[in-house]
Design a protein with these regions (language model features):
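N-terminal small-domain helix-loop-helix segment of the aminotransferase-like
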Residues: 2-7, 11-103, 110, 286-289
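Helix C-cap/helix->beta junction micro-motif
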Residues: 33, 139, 199-200, 230
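Conserved PLP-anchoring active-site segment centered on the Schiff-base-forming lysine
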Residues: 114-136
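Active-site phosphate-binding strand-loop segment of PLP-dependent enzymes
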Residues: 149-218
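Active-site PLP attachment segment
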Residues: 226-263, 278
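Structural motif of enzymes handling amino- and sulfur-group chemistry
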Residues: 258, 275-291, 296-297
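Structural signature of PLP-dependent enzymes
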Residues: 264-268, 287-310
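Conserved glycine-rich beta-strand-loop-beta hairpin in the small C-terminal domain of fold type I
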Residues: 284, 299-309, 320-332
């Protein structure tokens, strides 16, 4: 970000280190072209399922949505996440291990602001989502990018992580299924990475936002489900945006060590106060209500993948690794 000379003393100088979102910039450019089909922002193109809409409307009409909630979220919202983890993650969590936020992106922000001290390093496998690095910089940390290769299906190895580790390494960011590659780490790969993190006392930031969107028989394994030791090192970030087509509603959550969760809630309390109340009631319905619409959308994404992948692979000069999850194609 370039700061004009006449205004430079009016801005926080750390802004100069932030790049902004190139995806948003590209989206603005694409929006200016008449008749273009935009495949820019990472969101489903389905409307939010009606039962979820109705839950929010009901909360608005009967007055429940009119007021603040606890900063970390309604007790009912936390219980919905507890039940969701028991069903989809296979282990039991307590409400004090949950904090709900205004989107998974804000959950990530409060995590980095809670654990990163000036000079701490966070390892980020690339290709990656653009916001991890800038959020770490905002916490005065140092993002350390480790390049995953196309030959290894865009997945990093323990050997690569160890080569990047220093005495300042504090966090490993792990996004599986991946944005933008769509690749999924196997349970064996995750166990090796998790044990490495435990051995070196490195926190794992597990961005699981695409965990329900997997295709063609592939399976998502949460790294936090593999052992108690790995679970203690892991903060899981998830939300309702991708699986339930709720990107505009803005609700994400974090699950993990109660002390880290409490610190994240403290930051949220001084910034957003609480996640939007009506959205929380919508999210409760999303997480605990019928899941058939999730499967309908997943099948639609799978059909699109299986249609476009072979066509794109035929384009001269394009090399594409077939995604296993999320909803992106990442051609070379």
């Amino acid at each position: 970000m370039e700061i004009k000379k006449s205004l430079e003393n009016k801005f926080n100088t750390s802004l100069a280190n932030l790049t902004g979102s190139p995806i948003r910039e590209f989206d603005r450019y694409a929006s200016s072209i008449e008749g273009i089909i935009k495949l820019t922002l990472g969101e489903p193109d389905f409307p939010t399922p009606k039962n979820i809409q109705d839950a929010a409307i009901s909360a608005i009409k009967d007055g429940r949505a009119s007021f603040y909630t606890v900063t970390s979220g309604l007790p009912e919202s936390k219980e919905a996440i507890v039940a969701y983890f028991a069903k989809y993650y296979g282990y039991t969590i307590k409400p004090n291990q949950v904090t709900i936020a205004t989107g998974a992106k804000f959950s990530l922000y409060t995590f980095f602001m809670s654990v990163i001290n000036p000079g701490d390093e966070a390892i980020i496998p690339t290709p990656c989502w653009v916001s991890y690095g800038d959020q770490i910089k905002m916490a005065e940390g140092i993002p350390v990018f480790v390049q995953a290769t196309e030959a290894n299906h865009f997945k990093v190895t323990v050997e690569q992580l160890e080569a990047a580790r220093t005495e300042k390494t504090k966090v490993l960011v792990l996004n599986s299924p991946s944005n933008p590659t769509g690749m999924i780490y196997t349970a064996k790969e995750l166990l090796a990475i998790g044990n490495w993190a435990v051995e070196h006392d490195i926190l794992i930031l597990a961005d699981d936002i695409y965990g329900r969107l997997v295709y063609n028989g592939n399976e998502f394994t949460p790294i936090s489900s593999l052992s108690e030791a790995i679970r203690k090192q892991t903060i899981v970030i998830n939300g309702v945006s991708k699986s339930y087509s709720m990107t505009g509603w803005r609700l994400g959550y974090a699950v993990g060590d109660p002390e880290i969760i409490a610190a994240m809630s403290k930051i949220a309390g001084q910034t957003t106060s609480n996640p939007t109340t009506a959205t929380q009631y919508a999210a409760i319905e999303a997480l605990t209500g019928p899941q058939d619409t999730v499967e309908i959308m997943r099948q639609a994404f799978e059909e699109r993948l299986n249609t476009i992948y072979p066509l794109l692979s035929e384009v001269p000069g394009f090399d594409v690794v077939k995604p296993q999850g999320a909803f992106y194609l990442f051609p070379n």
